[in-house]
Amino acid sequence: MKTSVLAMAVGIGVMVAVPVLAADHVVPTAPKNYLDMKNPLKVNKDALERGGQVYERKCKKCHGANGDGKGEAAEKLTLKPASFVTPGYLKGRADGQLYFITEKGSPNTDMEAFGPGSETSLSKDDMWKVIAFIRKSYTK
């Protein structure tokens, strides 16, 4: 009986705490040297095609095929992935901020780091290409 009461209390505590923690999450900003960065690539058909391939392999499972944050893996996450299609979301983010998040990940979320030296280790070039693809495909 005591175990059941304890388990129920813990369960209620988790149900209350998770939304509160999620509400406190903010999209990470970036150090000034990143915020000042602009995408150095010439955005052309080839760059967008490669960015789309990277998005398909690395981003779609969480951010979704439509960039809405509703990928197949998103259901299992406490903090849902960013929806790139939310009006103003991408316009309010500097290229360097998106690069920083892609390279370093997002603290206290399941957004992993994709930069050189990470487990997935995308090249700088591929990170810029996927950012160009996201901007071109999902900016509202």
Question: Would you name each region that the model predicts?
Answer:
Residues 1-9:
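Bacterial N-terminal signal peptides that target proteins for export
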Residues 9-17:
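Bacterial N-terminal signal peptides
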Residues 22-23, 75, 82, 103-137:
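Axial heme c-ligation environment in periplasmic c-type cytochrome domains
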Residues 24-54:
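Electrostatic cytochrome c docking/interface patches
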Residues 31-35, 52, 56-79, 104-113, ...:
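Periplasmic/extracellular electron-transfer cofactor-ligation site
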Residues 68-99, 123:
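Gly/Gly-Pro-rich "capping" loops immediately C-terminal to redox-active cysteine motifs
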